[in-house]
From Swiss-Prot:
Highest taxon of the lineage: Eukaryota
Protein name: PHAF1 protein At3g51130
Membership in a protein family: Belongs to the PHAF1 family.
InterPro entries: PHAF1 (IPR005373), PHAF1/BROMI (IPR039156)
Disulfide-bond pairs as recorded: none
Pfam family, one: PHAF1
Length: 410
């Protein structure tokens, strides 16, 4: 992932500062869409689409932080943060889809709802202003421990800090907040949350934040389509119903999966030096070539002489790997044993969520790992480890999660 460097559990997008001298930070106006999103970012969008939006407008998004939990990337959200604009995007770690927009510094973000402005340095998002713009709603919830009052609309919530001297205006739990305090002041929004409004969940600060979930995918969506793997035989795509066997021709692949996103020649296999049975001279480029299906999390390798499929590479797209944001996550399922139904019942299946210790419990121990590294300049995340079984090789990150799976015929 060329455009990022790693600082702790944070990726920082590296690009020169492009903001023109004298340009106001608040000059950019983001459309506020309750239940839908903010600006170009929509609830439910894949993380790769969010990055595409960022790359298309580098003058606006010139400081971007990507935060994740390095030890267990499935435990916490992947967060894209825009510190200059005061908001961040929270992505569900499993589906890698946007579940929540959090505006944590409302004074930094100029928002437009319908034809009216709110937020930013010149338009305070006070309780009175919010009520006037969005209209009446049900009583909110007061969190006495945090001193925060949350006001809810469909797919949208506002948080207001309550000064200590006025906490008696609120009661813990559901409560109505007066438009003004006794001294004539009105509370000012400290945080805005935007989330899917297909359910009646109230999303706010603290534990309420965890209630935000991604909306269901439309029927027939290929995103996160389950791909069933029969090691040494084929891939089966469960939504489209395509079977992709080893030995298929490029024409077969085009017919079943469509035009590839990219085609490129394969570099010499660095692992072939360990094979005593391959006496061919080693060159930088071999005749083999890849079809890249980035939107499926899949690479297909063809033999340069026979033009038949010889390998499949499946990507998990975890942060902390050099290929992060190059592929959409491939939702593969590898069943241990011949009977897939029995594997489902027993739990003996390998998916992108399966860690390396669990793989060994299912498949048994294997030989020592080969270390794969690209150097700190091109890959700030360090080495990965490649373990081989019959017809399958696992590339494993230092945290024990699978980065890629390579399928071949022994």
């Amino acid at each position: 992932m060329k455009d990022y460097s790693k600082i702790g559990d944070k990726l920082v997008m590296q690009r020169p500062r492009r903001r023109l001298e004298g340009t106001a930070m608040g000059a950019t106006v983001f459309d506020l869409r309750p239940g839908v999103g903010i600006g170009p970012f929509s609830i439910g969008m894949p993380i790769c689409e969010a990055f595409a939006q960022i790359e298309q407008q580098p003058n606006i998004y010139d400081v971007v932080h990507v935060k994740y939990y390095d030890e267990d990337p499935l435990k916490l959200d992947v967060v894209i943060s825009f510190p200059d604009h005061g908001f961040h995007l929270r992505f569900d770690p499993w589906s890698q889809r946007l579940r929540l927009v959090e505006i944590f510094d409302v004074k930094r973000l100029q928002m437009r709802y319908a034809t009216s402005m709110i937020g930013g340095p010149s338009t305070l998002a006070t309780f009175v202003a919010v009520y006037a713009l969005f209209g009446p709603t049900f009583p909110g919830i007061y969190d006495k421990e945090r001193g925060i009052y949350s006001l809810f609309y469909p797919g949208l919530s506002f948080e207001f800090p309550i000064p200590n001297q006025y906490t008696d205006c609120c009661h813990d739990g559901e409560a109505a907040l007066p438009l003004e305090f006794p001294d004539g002041t009105t509370p000012v929004t400290c945080r805005v949350s935007i989330y899917d409004n297909s359910s009646d969940k109230k999303v706010g600060v603290g534990k309420l934040m965890d209630r935000a979930s991604v909306p269901p995918l439309p029927p027939g969506s290929l995103y996160m389509e389950e791909v069933h793997v029969k090691p040494g035989k084929e891939l089966y795509f469960t939504v489209g119903g395509q079977h992709m066997p080893f030995g298929a021709s490029p024409q077969d692949v085009w017919t079943e999966l469509g035009r590839p996103c990219g085609i490129h020649p394969k570099q010499v296999d660095q692992m072939v030096i360990h094979s005593a049975s391959d006496p061919r001279p080693k060159t930088t480029i071999c005749g083999d070539y890849f079809y890249n299906y980035f939107t499926r999390g899949l690479d297909i390798l063809f033999d340069g002489e026979t033009h038949k499929v010889k390998k499949f590479v499946l990507h998990t797209n975890y942060p902390g790997h050099a290929d992060f944001n190059s592929y959409i996550k491939c939702n593969f399922v590898i069943s241990a044993g011949a009977d897939a139904a029995e594997a489902n019942r027993s739990g003996n299946k390998i998916t992108p969520s399966t860690n390396w210790d669990q793989v060994k419990e299912i498949l048994g121990e294997c030989g020592p790992a080969a270390i794969q590294t690209q150097g700190s300049t091109s890959n700030p995340f360090g080495s990965t480890y490649v373990y081989g079984y019959q017809n399958v090789a696992f590339e494993v990150m230092k945290n024990g999660h699978i980065a890629t799976i390579t399928l071949f015929q022994s």
